[in-house]
């Protein structure tokens, strides 16, 4: 009898532990993925709420109303955006649109606030008594809408007709100040957009690009980590390198001769970085990439960002060599590439990107205020200082001179990434960088650049325009 009671107790304990484990896992999953599940377009609770609530306003950091609602006499709610078309187009991807064509914009990802799911019971009762539609909360963003418009205008001036992306953030706080994706569209007439144009796609957060030579920042960090003599060691660049029977060329078949890490970084020497990758091995390079967030599952509070990839299979010597300068199967979004530059600027510390500054009820009661959070420490402060020096040399004497702004200490890295689009070989131009005298980092991508061009001639001038605008904001 005692033995039987013991078995029952053991079974009860096992079941209790199992339910506790399931409960803990459930709460953990809700904490991580809850908002993503909640904002799913077919959530019946959300769809029902949208019929009975006037969505709150969305404002930029200066109080400019980016989206508001108009209610007709028959109770029909219409979402209204800024009167200036260029301003509407500049922020459409970060906001989203009322038709739900843009995935994971503020309009959808902040549904819980905009449609009043956080509203208290007394506010709900008041709305029922008066018979009026309840109003959702107002969301203030960290972005500067004028900066977004300036970025769009720079693209139109310097890369007319090109697709691309740009993002700007405060590297000390993680605040996203600007985010623009091209092609863009007018949210007031989104039904006229051709599906084939990919205009609904937010390239900043949803489009993982081949990073090209911007990834040399990670390779250089790996060298500094594993090789005590990395700064002084020289490798020989002959203009081409044969690995596994395949030839790796430098841009224009340039031959740099004996070259150290700083000069190789400044001149963006592919041969040198292929040799660095081969000498340190795939494991060391992958670990460095993962310290910067590659192969991570990005679960940021305010943004849905596509994961970045450092490949873990099919790692031939040729693929490892190509990885050294950001080719092979490595991919990263412009948002993540911006975080790489931001980590260097912030002494090795990568901040979580944040987009929501404040949420307030229609009566002004604060529901939420922004808080900064460290995402990860990518490298030591000393390593970050060395890389900052290298990135400064890129802008003063290397491939990124067109990003220079008088009166600002700009550091950066250019990239020209070979990839394909609809089966056609193309090259994308990239620039990542930051300013040392003001806390801003950025990433610019220009897609399908012309033959003979690179990130230094396409993306860097747009970065220069952005930095110049930021300088005048101070």
Label each residue range with its predicted role.
Residues 1-192, 199, 208, 233, ...:
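Periplasmic/cell-envelope proteins involved in peptidoglycan metabolism and beta-lactam response
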Residues 62, 126-127, 172-212, 218-448, ...:
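Beta-lactam-recognizing serine transpeptidase/beta-lactamase-like catalytic domain environment
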Residues 216, 338, 460, 464:
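Active-site scaffold segments
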